[in-house]
Amino acid sequence: TFSEDGKGTNKLANAELADKYGIVMGTSHHEPLCRAGVEWQNKYRQYGTSNAWDFNTNETAITKFWEDGVARNKNFENVYTLGMRGESDSSLSGTKEENIALLKKVITAQKDILKKNNLSDAPQVLTVYKEVEDYWHGTDKAEGLKKWDVLNDVTIMLCDDNFGNMRTLPTK
């Protein structure tokens, strides 16, 4: 990952240089709290025995993984990605209602991590791309993330469908 791609003994050299030049760092829509998906598969043994990228079954290990990402990058200016997708940027495995509840649990945990690191006021983003669009809008049985007040201080990035067609538009 960029934050650890520095040469020699200083693995944070790239992040330090970016910070020196005033570059605000962030990660993609499927790399929460400064942690890349490939990092998880390379480092999961530091956090437990399961490599499952599944917050339902591996919450403790994934939370610690995110905590370490924030600890590593908190001295630099970042935009913190919130949310979670399935392995390799896929959809989550539950029903829409289950996944809405899961994402609310995930985002609450992520915001708690930021708060513990005095980063509650740091910029945060939730990207509403195709894997999470249904959870944004919700269903007849479960209110989506769109009206969830926990996200009032989070930038919501609305995306196209890879062909230039907007999937969701702002209402205000």
Task: Give the ranges of each region predicted by the language model.
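Gly/Pro-rich turn-and-neighbor structural signature
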Residues: 59-172
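Feature activates predominantly on carbohydrate-active enzymes
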Residues: 1-65, 74-80, 150, 155-158, ...
